[in-house]
Every structure is written in structure tokens, then in C-alpha cells.
Amino acid sequence: MLEQMGIAAKQASYKLAQLSSREKNRVLEKIADELEAQSESILNANAQDVADACANGLSEAMLDRLALTPARLKGIADDVRQVCNLADPVGQVIDGGVLDSGLRLERRRVPLGVIGVIYEARPNVTVDVASLCLKTGNAVILRGGKETCRTNAATVAVIQDALKSCGLPAGAVQAIDNPDRALVSEMLRMDKYIDMLIPRGGAGLHKLCREQSTIPVITGGIGVCHIYVDESAEIAEALKVIVNAKTQRPSTCNTVETLLVNKNIADSFLPALSKQMAESGVTLHADAAALAQLQAGPAKVVAVKAEEYDDEFLSLDLNVKIVSDLDDAIAHIREHGTQHSDAILTRDMRNAQRFVNEVDSSAVYVNASTRFTDGGQFGLGAEVAVSTQKLHARGPMGLEALTTYKWIGIGDYTIRA
């Protein structure tokens, strides 16, 4: 089955690579229209997936990621339309010039070819990834989690209908609808057909892909994100940022999971934090230095376990640790961070600059929420993933991250001397 999908995707990629920006945008507009026109079939399929997931005891965080509503589906369709408005990087000349030999040389952006994406209970990823791949002239093979099997099948069917109505092969966007995990291992060895693989899931999936894939892998998306409250932070303003970073949508990878508090501000900051977290329904996991003071406040508090500093809660839980100074905070982030998104709240610009320079994450913030690490917020459109590695792409992966380049030399029967 996968062999045939690979062949179909590779053949489709050749046709997609020849499309103009106008033609690709027409396809995307058609997909957005069809997602709205056929929303009932997608929502019905999603309702079945959600019911099964509830019966199987899926966590609240995962259920939130899985569930579609009419508003969410409309938002997904609108995101596709936003991709239409983005500049097409394909065909862009990055640099070039004329050599001494007279050869005119240029480096031009081109599609990667076929993208493989493995993800969990995130039905929006199906459309986000498909739209970005099509905009950049790439075919895509999707493997969603078993929890989204019906939703993905219904969504991809709508996308394929739109493709065919525009004269393009259905092989441009395909989904593996068999939940057998053995197919993941088979997909990881499809280097004959797939040019880049993007896993979007937990640490186990990323480890599996790194160890077994014969395809170049872009890893990331695991967000053990930190906010360091420096001793010069403005408490009231800092709390607004922390509430946003923790509670706006706790199930996302850019949600803060650990709060590092400078010891010199702890006595005034912790009571205010407890009051605010109680109002926000957040459970605090406190270290020994913060535990007694936080237990005296209104928030729900438990003693932090050492392994929780490495956890991506994806829920209304927040670690709180007292640190001696900026060096201590940076050391903690280096040990427990996932190089996703980390922030400092401070009025000391020297400390801010040190934090930016010394915290080696894909996104580092000064006096701002970690929730900004998002393709839409960065002006990149819907993102295919957030990369926490350093080669090829880093941070939210927009259109350029789905391209490579080729060197093109144009001569007049020019030969090398």
C-alpha cells in the first residue's frame, strides 16, 4: 500500500512543481471553499472520533487537540485562505551573478518534492500541512494518529475532491488511514519517495524517527518552555504574561511549563502568583524553597517531583522553582529545556541580553509570552511544525522551510577553461 502511495506522491510532485503561484492559489481557494461546503461530513466524522477517544480514556489535553467545532473548522478554512495571501518562495532567486567565464549563475528556490508528516490527535494539522505543501509545490503523505482516523479520512477526501476539480492528481495529498503502527516503521524507510519527514508528537515518536528513519528528519514540537522572573520584573505585568503563557490554550507546545523565580523577588511575587493561579485554576508544583509560602496562599499546590521538570504537562499545571540568579535560571533551562521557547521578564536589559545570547532555544523572548511561537503569529501563515533542531529549519516552519534550492548555470555554449 505505501509503495503505491509513494509512487503516486512522487508523480504528483512533478506536476505540482510546474504550477504557477496563481494556479496554486486557485487550488487552495477551492480547498477552503470545499472544507466549508462539506463541513458536516468532517464534523460528523470528528464527533465519532471524539466519542471513541472519550470511551478509551484519552486525556483532556488530547481531547482538546482532537475536537473540531464549526468555529474551529471555519478557522482552519480561513487559515488556508491566508496561505493564498503569502508570498510564494518557489522560483525566488536567492543570489547569483556572472562568473569570469561568462556563465550566469543563480541559486533558485525549488520544492523539496514529497513531504512525510507523522502526527497525533491534531486534525487541523492535516489541512495546515497540506496547504503549506501545496503552496510550495510539494506532495505530502500524512499519517495521523489512530484517534483522528475518521476525521483525517473525511478531510483528505474533501482535499482530494478539490484537487481533482482543479485538474490535479489526488496523489498530491494522501493519508495513511490504517492505524497499524508497523506502517510507521515502513514509512520511515521510504527514502525512495519521501524527501523530508516531520514527526509531530511526543518524545517517543521523535526518538523512533531519529533511530529508524532513512529519510532526513526535522524534529521538534516538544515544548518544555520556561519563563524566568528576574528580580527587577514588574510583578503585575509579569503575572499577565504568565497567565497568558499558561492558560490561553494549555494543550499547545508553546505553553509555559516551568516558572523560574529569582530568590530576591520571591517574597513579594509568590503571594501574588498564588492568588492569580487560584483564579486561573492552575495547580502549582513547587520546589522546597517555594512550597511553604505557596501553600499559605489560595492556589492548589503540590510538591514538585524531580522528573516533572522534564514534563510537557499540556494542562493547567505549572512548576515553580526558586533560583539564585540569572546563571542559575540559564543552567536549569539548559538541563531541562527542549530548545523550543523560553522567556525572561525583567527591566534589566543587560540580563535580557545575556538571556537572549545564552539560552539556546529556537525562540527566546524578553517581556513577552512564549505563546507567540506560532507560524501565524510570526507572519509565516499556518506552520507545518516547530523545529527545535538547528539544521535546515528552526522555529515555526513556514513556506521557506518546505523548499530547497538548486544552482542554475546559463551559458552560451560555455566551457570550463
Curated annotation (Swiss-Prot):
From the Swiss-Prot or TrEMBL record, state where the protein is found. Cytoplasm
**Top-level taxonomic group:** Bacteria
Q: Which GO terms describe its cellular component?
A: cytoplasm
Pathway terms, separated by semicolons: Amino-acid biosynthesis; L-proline biosynthesis; L-glutamate 5-semialdehyde from L-glutamate: step 2/2
EC class: oxidoreductase
Q: Which UniProt keywords apply?
A: Amino-acid biosynthesis, Cytoplasm, NADP, Oxidoreductase, Proline biosynthesis
- Output the Gene Ontology terms for molecular function: glutamate-5-semialdehyde dehydrogenase activity; NADP binding
**An individual GO BP term:** L-proline biosynthetic process
The primary location reported for this protein is cytoplasm
| Enzyme Commission designation | 1.2.1.41
* InterPro entries per the UniProt record, alphabetical: Ald_DH/histidinol_DH, Ald_DH_C, Ald_DH_N, Aldehyde_DH_dom, G-glutamylP_reductase_CS, Glu-5-SA_DH, GPR_dom
Alphabetized Pfam families for the sequence: Aldedh
The entry assigns this protein to a family as follows:
Belongs to the gamma-glutamyl phosphate reductase family.
Give the protein's biological function: Catalyzes the NADPH-dependent reduction of L-glutamate 5-phosphate into L-glutamate 5-semialdehyde and phosphate. The product spontaneously undergoes cyclization to form 1-pyrroline-5-carboxylate.
Protein name (database record): Gamma-glutamyl phosphate reductase
| Species of provenance | Escherichia coli O6:K15:H31 (strain 536 / UPEC)
